[in-house]
Structure formats: structure tokens, C-alpha cells
């Protein structure tokens, strides 16, 4: 079976089509939004680590840096980070389905043990920005 994913992006709409053996199987269309919504996933860059809060501020393209706490990294952060690191420009990416899971991160660990300023991480918006605060991430 030959699968093909076709993505068309315009200024007003994103269309994604999945074809199997040149037959359309699934079509998703989404209106472009300029805002950041809960559930959106981004590659962000760590801007500042706050050891006292055990948290970090991450640039995801929002006017204010987003906030992520150590407890929101997720137990499989190390495995996910290895996938993200292997898919950076200039690196040869391995197959995700053959990668082995890394050990879970400690429940009461330090964020600085896993993140560094300038590091690229995959994040999801858990709470939208309000007032003077940027989005909350997980």
C-alpha cells in the first residue's frame, strides 16, 4: 500500500489530504488562526531557566515567553527530547518506531538537569495567555 500525505497552506486555510494508492482516504481543512490556542503543539526554544521555581520560560513565537514547570515535562520527556534532537536540521533522523524508551524522569527532580538555555523542545499549550502572562505549557 502506497500512502501519501498532501499539505496545502494558503493565507486563509490549511488543507491536509491522506491518499492510499492514489485514492483520497481522509481530508482535513482548518481555517488559519493567528492566535495561540490550547492544544497547539510547537517547537520552542528555552530562553530562561528559573531554578527557584523549578521552571523555564520558552519562546514559542508568542509576544510573551511561555512558562513550563518541571512537573509538566512529562515522565517520558527524555525519550521525546531524543526524537526532537534527532530531527534537527543537519542531523540524520532514525526511525521513531525502532527507538527505545529512555528511563522516566524523576518525580521530584530539577528542571535544570533536563533543560538548558537555547535548547529546542516540543511543547503543547495547556493554558492560553492572560493579562501580562504568556501561555502555560506542558
Task: Give names to the regions the model predicted.
Residues 1-138:
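Single-stranded RNA-binding surfaces
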